UniProtKB/Swiss-Prot annotation:
Residues 313-332, 424-466 are annotated as: Disordered. SUPFAM superfamilies: FKBP-like, Triger factor/SurA peptide-binding domain-like, Trigger factor ribosome-binding domain. Pfam families: FKBP_C (PF00254), Trigger_C (PF05698), Trigger_N (PF05697). This is Trigger factor. The keyword Nucleotide-binding does not apply. It is found in: Cytoplasm. Involved in protein export. Acts as a chaperone by maintaining the newly synthesized protein in an open conformation. Functions as a peptidyl-prolyl cis-trans isomerase. Residues 426-444 have a biased composition (Acidic residues).
Length: 466
């Protein structure tokens, strides 16, 4: 099999693949076997119909088309592997020349275009300086954390005043579309300002008093009319506010393992300090990505971005929202650029993903969705998403390696210890040889690199071939 590779653009490649009759023969044999098992011909059992009879009843043209369709994916995969092409998205195949359908002589000529990962030049990582906020813990920070803990032990008390943010409203809801009632809910307890119910509900309830009713328009969040605008009538039955317990020794003993409120405050101070240190690490990672994206030119296939944007908007039922489309386009392009950048770093730094790392990552993912880990892994496997998880781990490790080479200081000029956020280059083998960034050239939402080509309309056979 001969393949020529033509670079159409930094992100688009054309493969011209020439397949000899000998190389196509296994697919032709399989085509005869498959057709023999499908057709009903008197005098022959299924699967036992001779090729000559299939030629008479079905036709060699059908056999050839079946063989080409069956072999196309394999020819493409082999060409990609032999020529070290790194695809992104779904390839498009055109059959330029067919073998002679009378005796299957002559080469099969395939032309396949595919978006590819661009070649990028990585900068030196030494000398990068990042500045993050100082992790200073104030008394107000500690009291804020204490109040959050107290709110978990609060009681709700009915009050006679207008509702405001932070109150719990006891409400009834009625949704109408075109004057017809489509949904109702009674006696719901909702925290005003949480944004967890329906768009516009916080503004509608603000300053409302018990017994009052108001109407507003908003898209429904679920049900048969999800996404449709409806007239929402909300009736406020009661307003309740949190009553926090006293911050004393009794509260410390009830809410923690400590005997005194002083000990509890000291423990909360440590929690706040750890949270701020974690925030420094997160901020440093984000800054590092932004700085690297500024330093490296990374073109992204336009179709790849457009496909992702369309999927996103379709899920949100906002295909006609041009303003939101622009926002999603910018976000998607940045996401792809970041993934390409980190994959390149992972490859240069020889990042490997061990089975233990993958297992830990999957267990954490299952916990986020409150799922059994085995069931979570099963679903990911059925949807071909395991390799995407491997890629995500590799990217995180790649970023941690670069972060370890950067100088991180706070706004006071003090060196920041980010030991928990950095990593050293791998020098061992991954447990799973396939668990490398190359398995995930495409992000989770993309078509995998070895996806079967999408065949265009085939060129008509010449009259001399028939």
């Amino acid at each position: 099999m001969k393949t020529t590779v033509e670079k159409l653009s930094p992100t688009r490649t054309k493969l011209t693949i020439s397949v000899t009759p000998e190389e196509l023969q296994p697919s032709i044999k399989h085509a005869y076997e498959h057709i023999a098992g499908q057709v009903n011909i008197p005098g022959f059992r299924k699967g036992k119909v001779p090729p000559a009879i299939i030629d008479q009843r079905v036709g060699k043209e059908a056999v050839l088309e079946h063989a080409v369709n069956e072999g196309l994916d394999g020819f493409y995969r082999l060409a990609v592997e032999e020529n070290e092409v790194r695809p992104l998205g779904r390839p498009e195949a055109d059959i330029s020349e067919w073998p002679n359908e009378k005796d299957f002589s002559g080469d099969l000529l395939l032309t396949i275009e595919v978006d590819v990962r661009p070649e990028i030049t990585l900068p030196a990582f030494d000398g990068i300086t990042l500045t993050v906020e100082a992790a200073q813990v104030t008394p107000d920070d500690v009291e804020e954390e204490l109040d959050r803990l107290r709110s978990r032990f609060c009681t709700l008390v009915t009050v006679d005043r207008p509702a405001k943010k932070g109150d719990f409203a006891q409400i009834d809801l009625v949704a109408e579309i075109g004057g017809e009632e489509v949904d109702t809910a009674a006696n719901i307890s909702y925290e005003i300002g949480s944004g967890e119910l329906i768009e516009g509900i916080d503004e509608a309830l603000d300053t409302l008093t018990a017994g009052e009713t108001t109407t507003f328009e908003a898209p429904l969040m679920g049900g048969d009319h999800e996404g449709e605008n409806a007239q929402i009538t909300v009736t406020l039955n009661a307003v309740k506010e949190r009553e926090l317990p006293e911050a004393d020794d009794d509260f410390a003993q009830i809410s923690s393992e400590f005997d005194t409120i002083g000990e509890l405050r000291e423990s909360l101070r440590g929690q706040v300090e750890r949270a701020k240190s974690f925030g420094q690490g997160t901020a440093a990672r984000d800054q590092l990505v932004e700085k690297l994206l500024e330093l490296v030119e990374i073109p992204v296939p336009a179709q790849l971005v457009e496909d992702e944007v369309s999927r996103h908007l379709e899920q949100e039922s906002r295909l006609e929202d041009d303003e939101h489309r622009a926002e999603v386009t910018e976000s998607s392009e940045k996401t792809f650029r970041t993934q390409i950048l980190l994959d390149e770093i992972a490859q240069r730094e020889n990042v490997k993903v061990s089975q233990d790392e993958l297992t830990q990552y999957l267990v954490q993912g299952a916990a986020q969705y409150n799922m059994d880990p085995n069931e979570f892994v099963k679903i990911l496997g059925e949807n071909g998403q395991i390799s995407s998880m491997v890629g995500e781990i590799a990217r995180n490790k790649a970023l941690a390696i670069v972060l370890g080479k950067a100088e991180v200081v706070d706004t006071n000029g003090k060196q920041v210890d980010l030991t928990e956020f950095v990593a050293l280059p791998d020098d061992g083998e991954a447990v799973d040889e396939d668990a490398t960034p190359e398995d995930t050239d495409a992000p989770a939402e993309e078509a995998p690199a070895a996806e079967k080509p999408k065949k265009k309309a085939a060129a008509k056979k010449k009259a001399a071939d028939k």
